[in-house]
């Protein structure tokens, strides 16, 4: 590790097997400005470790693109551990629930947009863009959310607030600037994206921070002192000479731009009126007139309106059809893109634009939106491609397009440093598959193993989970209806042994790193289709490749082409690994991977609480006899702070104790209040 380098890789391991050769090939091609490369790495060969080494050698800001939030969360954890002193960030959709605006002409049903935003992920998204604007040592792990419209990087950077000690500036001007950046004044509840004023002291809680706020102390119009403080207690952490505060939203716009945008929105409305009058569509004319005029009034009075993103083209002064700014525009021109599980991620990138366009077409046709709403959209594939400087496609089963882009050259990584072989695959009849699978589950669980069970539908995964639970088998299901944070928590609980069987569909395929899994059972393996294709079967089998006892059972009444090809590839790779093991005297061993916390829900900061120590219970029990209401509230803040600190340092039992103590004080608070 070279301390003069920006990206510093921290690991106790050295590249081995065919990792060194893969790293050298990838780095050499990147330095030679080759645009596209393919890394074909089997499950368990250390593709993530290889890419971490590549980043450390090329020293470039990197975007790692994953095809779902679960895989993105896992990659974020891993890169955070590899680069603890660099800005490793997480950028995925911040919606826990999202119902887009839509209209169904057949039933004349208008569906208003409804959503629930995850505050933690919103903070992480803002932290990601702030890091890109302030630092060069940035690694961002993202889902396809990165190709959706985001606020202009020029406006976001240009509207920041820079304060320095000794600077002369009126306090009211600072407050007005904060409001323009969409911060709210709140002198009672100090939370993210708010500020409070107490005499000559101004406290600001940046939108991208979690446990750090800024205190600005003034004397008249002079900034006398700037400090970093604890937002819970107000305790000063350290004095600083200057600070730059970034907006609390990516969709900020300077006032002069907003006024110009309102003019162009009115002009577009006039054009649309004429169109509907010519077509004699008076109902649609009334709709668009009423909706747009109301939005313009809101923009004039409060600076924003519901569905403001549909006017994004006007606010960014783009031409019709021009692509919106997105996360890719925040990166410097020489950034490196890594597309993980590219055979899955690229089709997603292709599909995003068409799905969005079809829904909005109806809204525009029937007068619910102006045509400019079309330009609030994800990027087309060719627009994404045009923003790529250099890319590495990473997959165990790369698609033909990626290979063609790389000029037919593939960097292979087929050896597992752990010596683990591809799992033995057994074919069993599909008739009676559930009962047979149950017996196998009991056998593996009794030995401390975990089981992945894949089905073809969400409904079947839920019904099968209920059936297993009724038979005293601890099981949970995982599919796309489960929100981001909960998915991560479910996988962590499986690894910890809170339950033993995870039932799912395609979320149990690419990238999930669960070394405790000793059995993968594939129901209805002979049902040819997307979920039982050659690629899908190889990827699903790979989930058992991190355990020395790993096995796969396919339940099928016939051997399909996909099953046959999977068996051939697996046998070939087993033979290659066995030769390597014999040559180097390696005994296969199960991967050991630390179980860490990525994000905790607000409700349950710690997954596995222990019993609270008796003295803590006693202290909380007796507290109401001598504590005032203000003292109880201070105790709650102290407990919350200690709980978060313990959880962040992975002292889970202690964190659970603090959480339980906090809840006791909250009950006492209710009684006293």
Curated annotation (Swiss-Prot):
Main location as per UniProt: cytoplasm
Short sequence motif named Beta-hairpin, residue ranges: 94-117
UVR domain: residues covered: 633-668
Family indicated by similarity: Belongs to the UvrB family.
HAMAP family: UvrB
Entry's free-text remark on domains: The beta-hairpin motif is involved in DNA binding.
Quaternary state and interactors: Forms a heterotetramer with UvrA during the search for lesions. Interacts with UvrC in an incision complex.
Protein name: UvrABC system protein B
Gene that specifies this protein: uvrB
